[in-house]
Amino acid sequence: MGSRKLLIITTALTFLLSTLSPANANNPPRKILSGWLPDYSLARNLPTVEGNLDLIRDISPFWYGLTGENSIKDKYALGKYTTPKEQVIARLKANGILLLPTITDDNNKLVLANLLANPTSRSNIVQTIKALVLKYNYDGIDLDFETFYTQDGRSSWAALKPNWIAFIKELSTALHDQGKLLSVTTPPDFAPETKRAGNWIYSWAEIGPLIDRLRIMAYDFSTTSPGPIGPLPWTEDGVKYAITQMPASKVFLGIPGYGRDWITKVEGVCPKDFTSSVVVGAKAAVVMREAPNLAASNNALPTYNTTNAESTFTYKKTYVDPTNSASFCTASRTVWYPDERSYAARTNLVGKYRLGGIAVWTFGMENTAAITAVRDIAKSIAPDQVIGTLSTDLEEIGYGSTFNLTGTFKLPDKTPVPALNVRFEIKNSSDNNWRTLSAGVTDLAGVIAFPIILGQKSQIRLVSEGSWERTEGKTIEKVISVVPNVSLSLPASIKVATSYTVYGQVLPKVAGIKLVVKQNKKPLGEFTTDASGGFSFEIKAATTGLATYQVVISAGEKNTAAISDEITILVR
């Protein structure tokens, strides 16, 4: 019994622990851009994402709605789009983007609140969401449950709050156990001293330790009457309160890419085709990229309001009966919308408060100048890059054996990076996601070393912890092969012409390892290990003397090839 002898091979891999911007390799921007990708207009919206990969860590396809404790509506499927959803997912994942699809509350008033109050229903919702994430191998989920504040009413919040917190705790555990992320999107909340009407039901302080992202919807300030969509002082107050409730790195500021066009006055009698739509208080949406054309086509001159950090203009529009030119009315309209300066003012809060980033509603609404403004700020707050080397004394080990891994981390100017938290991660054939096997901290020379034991063939990498000052770093992946151990329950001697059952054990204990047993150097049969790594075969010697047995293991995705020592027994 035994395994084949191995050569010790030393390798060194040099890698850059940050994704470099193709435009400027010396100053890659901080990845601060995230946001929502609606199911519609993918032909326009996807290029915004794919053209700015150096700014983006994750996005949220806005595709799902919770309709019951066991049911989720697939908005993409209902749209009957020609491109299969799986193709869109694969396309985004191929670009290295984390996918945290958004699920909204599509129930009627108080339905979700009542479901969360029932422990069984609450658990069912958790499992329903978890199943969705695992089905498509998403990187997590983003909750956008707005019914609490748009329909349920504040009088329901006191009873709802503990159930909401319990739900987030249970969902967090279920997702984190699978290596998945939990993002929660909420309207703003505010410190009591601001005297602003907040949304305390979302319990930022209580859910902060449980979630990975908080996205603040800093928009819809003005809805029924003309005004800024998300005035900057109001927005900043929400940010300032959020970072007192949880780490700033978890906070993402939601930024609108849209504005509104309100009717403030109507003169004359509107033709019948317009009597219901052209009324005081009616409003239409206008997206950033289209607002300048709307102003120009109506001879309006937008002005930028520096206090609110948004643009505004007014104009008049006449609505004429197509069959009677004498029948018309004229509406006075007021427009508020964000532009590139609005994006810049809000993105500057990322650096000011060291936030996780911004989240745009939605990708594709912005103009080119807005993305340029985000990029310029992202470059100005770019974190340091870290360069590392990874070396191992073995590329192939026997089962149960140790190999040594050493990493060295330096800045581009060769300065060592001490006290850097580094994780050693592995991924084998049974893993859907990378998992941490060991962790440590670099010494004064920027060096970290791990003695490692692997049970089966695995990919390995080092990942340095990200911080405001430095990016998270991921090395290239390296494969360490594991040579299985084999044991046989052969007796020291057997009787001639007598059948014996021999049991074998392969370590690691995994199913599906294929092997050949040889008797006197000739194949006795082909076998496959069961779930415990075991196998069995029959022997029967025809003559007295000595008999030899040997096991030859074929290479597979879980193991490398191996040959045991020959075992000799007496046949009497």
Model region roles, listed by residue range:
Residues 26-131:
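Glycan-recognition patch characteristic of GH18 chitinases/ENGases
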Residues 59, 143, 171, 214, ...:
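Conserved, mostly hydrophobic/aromatic
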Residues 69-83, 149-294:
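Substrate-binding surface in catalytic domains of secreted glycosidases
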Residues 257-346, 378-381:
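Glycan-binding loop/region signatures in secreted carbohydrate-active enzymes
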Residues 380-413, 479-501, 506-507:
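Beta-strand-rich domain onsets/edges
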Residues 411-436, 508-523:
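Short flexible loop/turn segments that cap and initiate beta-strands
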Residues 436-450, 529-538, 545:
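Glycine-centered loop-to-beta-strand initiation motif
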Residues 454-476, 547-563:
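Enriched for extracellular/lumenal, surface-exposed ectodomains of secreted and cell-surface proteins
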